[in-house]
Swiss-Prot record:
CDD domains: uS7_Bacteria (cd14869). Belongs to the universal ribosomal protein uS7 family. It comes from the Bacteria. The keyword Plastid does not apply. One of its GO terms (biological process) is translation. Gene3D superfamilies: Ribosomal protein S7 domain. Keywords: Ribonucleoprotein, Ribosomal protein, RNA-binding, rRNA-binding, tRNA-binding. Pfam families: Ribosomal_S7 (PF00177). Part of the 30S ribosomal subunit. Contacts proteins S9 and S11. The lineage of its organism: Bacteria, Bacillati, Actinomycetota, Actinomycetes, Streptosporangiales. InterPro entries: Ribosomal_uS7, Ribosomal_uS7_bac/org-type, Ribosomal_uS7_CS, Ribosomal_uS7_dom, Ribosomal_uS7_dom_sf. This is Small ribosomal subunit protein uS7. It comes from Thermobifida fusca (strain YX).
Length: 156
């Protein structure tokens, strides 16, 4: 650990269209090879498509999707006397949001629709309705933490 203490948290800029740091974080997750304008068009078109598909405000859809995918528990490996245990630990709020965005984009990329815009739009709509692969990933993570509850006394 550095002597100066932990590095200060940087505030994300708000995006120009919605004025939300969550949308900026989503754009940063979609970003590949420094092509920010492409990532922005993918995210904005996906949010507009979600508005047309559901008739709801895109920011509400995004927020609900993130809330449905955020994990509250995860397992971390801990080595104790030659054995490695999967120890369940609580997830900090900032990490849970980061994981939710990561899983949404990861599972959107694995979908079978033709364009990334369609994939992201459908994954966001599914996640906001409590469906989709990203929500399943959260449930699997919670199930893993629940099944390893016996090792909770090893947490640090």
């Amino acid at each position: 650990m550095p002597r100066k203490g932990p590095a200060p948290k940087r505030q994300l800029m708000t995006d120009p269209v919605y004025g939300s740091p969550l949308v900026t974080a989503l754009i940063n997750k979609v970003l590949r090879d420094g092509k920010r304008s492409l990532a922005q068009s993918i995210v904005y078109n996906a949010l507009e498509g979600a508005r047309e598909k559901t008739g709801q405000d895109p920011l509400v859809i995004l927020k609900r999707a993130i809330d449905n995918v955020k994990p509250t528990l995860e397992v971390r490996s801990r080595r104790v006397g030659g054995a490695t245990y999967q120890v369940p630990v609580e997830v900090r709020a900032s990490r849970s949001t980061t994981l939710a965005l990561r899983w949404l984009v990861q599972y959107a990329r694995l979908r079978r629709e033709k364009t990334m815009t369609e994939r992201l739009m459908n994954e966001l709509v599914d996640a906001s309705n409590g469906l989709g692969a990203a929500v399943k990933r959260r449930e699997d993570t919670h199930k893993m933490a629940e099944s390893n509850k016996a090792f909770a006394h090893y947490r640090w």
